[in-house]
Amino acid sequence: MRIIYKQQTMNNNRRDFIKKLGIATAAIAINPLEAKNLLDTSEPKTTNKPIVLSTWNFGLHANVEAWKVLSKGGKALDAVEKGVRLVEDDPTERSVGYGGRPDRDGRVTLDACIMDENYNIGSVACMEHIKNPISVARAVMEKTPHVMLVGDGALEFALSQGFKKENLLTAESEKEWKEWLKTSQYKPIVNIENHDTIGMIALDAQGNLSGACTTSGMAYKMHGRVGDSPIIGAGLFVDNEIGAATATGHGEEVIRTVGTHLVVELMNQGRTPQQACKEAVERIVKIVNRRGKNLKDIQVGFIALNKKGEYGAYCIQDGFNFAVHDQKGNRLETPGFALK
C-alpha cells in the first residue's frame, strides 16, 4: 500500500510539472518573469523576518526604535510609527517634523501617511503646529471614516485627540529662512545633506507588512504645496499579499507615476524588490526626459520589501542610501543608480 501511494505521488508530481511546463511555455512570450515563477519547483525559501527598511542615514537610528518593537514580536504598524517618530522629534533633522525647514512664508507644514496590513490608511497634509504628524495620520486611520485630513482641518482634529500645539520653527531654521529671503531663489538641492523624507517599511514576525512616511517637504516651497509623502500609492504603498514600498526625493516626479504603487505592482507581476525599484526609477527617468527636464536636478529613490523579507532599492543618481535592520544587524546600504 505504501509503495502504491508513493507511485501515485510520483505520478501526480510528474503531471503537475508537465502542466506547469505547458503553462509556462505559453507564458514566455507574454511575460518571461511569470514563466520563470511557474517553472520554479524548489522549496519556498525561509522568510527573512522580522525586518525593517528606512530611507537615508537617519534611518539607522529610526530602525533601532522600530527593532525594539519587532524583536519582541510586536506589530509592524507599531514599529514603523515608533521608528519615524524618533526622526520627527529630532530638531537637528531639517526635513522632518520639529525643526523642519519652513515654506517661503516661514511656516513649517508637515505631511505624513501610514498604512497597515489590512489596507487601512491614514494621512495628513499641510498640517502646522503638531510635532508628530505620523501619529495624527494613524489617528485619522483608526478614529475617522476618512483617509486624509489637510491644513486647519488636520490641526483641529489633532487638537481634539489631545495632541499638543507647538511652535515647530526652530531658531536655526528661522535663521536659514531669513537668509533665503534675501535672494528668494527656489531651487531644491539634490541630496542636500543626505536628508529628506523618512519612509519606513517593515515585515513583522507574524508575516505582516506596514509602512510609514513623514516629511516637512521641500524647503521654501509655496505655502500649501503637498508632495508625495502623504499620498498613498505615491510616497507609500503596502499590499500584505505582495510587498511594500516607499519613496524619497522630488515628490512631484513620484506622484506622476504613482511610484510606490508601481513598485508593488511590479513585484506582483514577478519582479524582485530590486528589479521593481529599478524599473520604476527607469520609468521616471523616461518621463523626465520626455518632458525636457534636466535629470541632474532631480533625485528619486525607492526602497521595497516583499513577503519573503527580500528587499531592494534604486535611485536616479548617486547620493541616496537606506538603512536595513534584520537578524544580521543594523546597517546602511547604497543602491544602484540610473544616472552614471
UniProtKB/Swiss-Prot annotation:
The EC number(s) given in the record are 3.5.1.26
Q: Describe the reaction catalysed, as an equation.
A: N(4)-(beta-N-acetyl-D-glucosaminyl)-L-asparagine + H2O = N-acetyl-beta-D-glucosaminylamine + L-aspartate + H(+)
Task: List the active site.
Answer: T197 (nucleophile)
Q: Where is the signal peptide?
A: 1-45
Any idea where this protein resides?
Answer: Periplasm
Q: In the UniProt record, which is one GO cellular component term?
A: periplasmic space
> At which positions is substrate bound?
R225, V226, G227, D228, T248, G249, H250, G251
Keyword Hydrolase found? yes
TM ranges are: none
* Coiled coil stretches, renumbered: none
Q: Name one GO biological process term.
A: proteolysis
Q: Keywords of this protein's UniProt record, alphabetized?
A: Autocatalytic cleavage, Hydrolase, Periplasm, Protease, Signal
PTM: Cleaved into an alpha and beta chain by autocatalysis; this activates the enzyme. The N-terminal residue of the beta subunit is responsible for the nucleophile hydrolase activity.
The enzyme's first-digit EC class, named in words, is hydrolase
Family matches, as InterPro entries:
Ntn_hydrolases_N, Peptidase_T2, TAT_signal_bac_arc
Molecular function per GO: N4-(beta-N-acetylglucosaminyl)-L-asparaginase activity; peptidase activity
Its biological function? Cleaves the GlcNAc-Asn bond which joins oligosaccharides to the peptide of asparagine-linked glycoproteins. Requires that the glycosylated asparagine moiety is not substituted on its N-(R1) and C- (R2) terminus.
Family in the record: Belongs to the Ntn-hydrolase family.
Q: How does it assemble?
A: Heterotetramer of two alpha and two beta chains arranged as a dimer of alpha/beta heterodimers.
Protein name as it appears in the record: N(4)-(Beta-N-acetylglucosaminyl)-L-asparaginase
